[in-house]
Amino acid sequence: MAMTLLEDWCRGMDVNSQRALLVWGIPVNCDETEIEETLQAAMPQVSYRVLGRMFWREENAKAALLELTGAVDYSLIPREMPGKGGLWKVVFKPPTSDAVFLERLHLFLAREGWTVQDVARVLGFQNPAPAPGPEMPAEMLNYILDNVIQPLVESIWYKKLTLFSGKDIPGPGEETFDSWLEHSNEIIEEWQVSDIEKRRRLMESLRGPAADVIRILKTNNAAITTAECLKALEQVFGSVESSRDAQVRFLNTYQNPGEKLSSYVIRLEPLLQKVVDKGVIDKDNVNQARLEQVIAGANHSGALRRQLWLAGAEEGPAPNLFQLLVQIREEEAKKEEEEAEAALLQLGLEGHF
């Protein structure tokens, strides 16, 4: 009955029923001032305005319709409140999960002094985002979830880069530049945010001379990209290695004892790419060079090495990195399975005797 009255009253006043409260059970002799004082005492943290009051004949009491005027935490709205003549009842439509989410988002941003538009601007979006509200259409809600909320979550919870200072004597736990750069590239690739945000996160990880380099670059070019920043850091702090030295290191990198061949191939790849970058190996010959070094550097004998040798001897193109790893891992899995079966057979024979 109370819910029906709430909906009908809201419909008659063109008010969103999910943004309204019905307070009833108010004594007939309770004046406007007493009603307002009771409401404020029961809901001090809820923003509202009284739209009207009426006498509810069936309950022989007054009822008041309130409109919620700001972001609301529905957990702060009581179902009953102490007032003149006893407990006053409070009725409101349970909000949908989307509405609750948007209200909480709005509250969070309001406490921080931000709006959804501010978040979108900081994250680098060109089109202004619409302000959230419980009555928001589905397509607008999807826009905010995809273009504002997801980046907001990404900007709060993300994998951070380790620190790098570029000092001659690295700080405790600080990596060498080459190691830091390799790990940083992997992490930056995972970030699903704008390049402006990527650059900001990169700056968070820099200290000392490394941070000074990027600040100078930004002064000369405010639109410098994250990739350009990393390239500049590599030019300043990267190891100085001649093309000949890079080639020698690549050709003298062998599979370690106990190391899987697939792991060796992955370890070899950065060295190969460095040789290519220095122009020692043409990009069109990368796959062939990789295959030849894997054959030369592998300490495995047997079927797998023969297969690789045959692949290199064929007239067709050498397998690329992905194809090579698939082939190697299939053979490794087959070998592990054969070794496991042999071990079980050996155990069975020992038990028999």
From Swiss-Prot:
Q: Which UniProt keywords apply?
A: Nucleus
Which Gene Ontology terms describe the biological processes this protein takes part in? inflammatory response to antigenic stimulus
- Localization in the cell: Nucleus, Nucleolus
Give the record's family classification: Belongs to the PNMA family.
Nucleus as UniProt keyword: yes
Query: What domain of life does the native source organism fall in?
Result: Eukaryota
What is a single cellular component term in the Gene Ontology annotation?
cytoplasm
Main subcellular localisation: nucleus
Is the keyword Nucleus assigned to this protein? yes
Q: What is this protein's name? A: Paraneoplastic antigen Ma1 homolog
**InterPro entries listed in its UniProt record:** PNMA (IPR026523), PNMA_C (IPR048270), PNMA_N (IPR048271)
**Expression sites by tissue:** Predominantly expressed in testis. Very low levels in the brain, including in the piriform cortex, hippocampus and some subcortical nuclei.
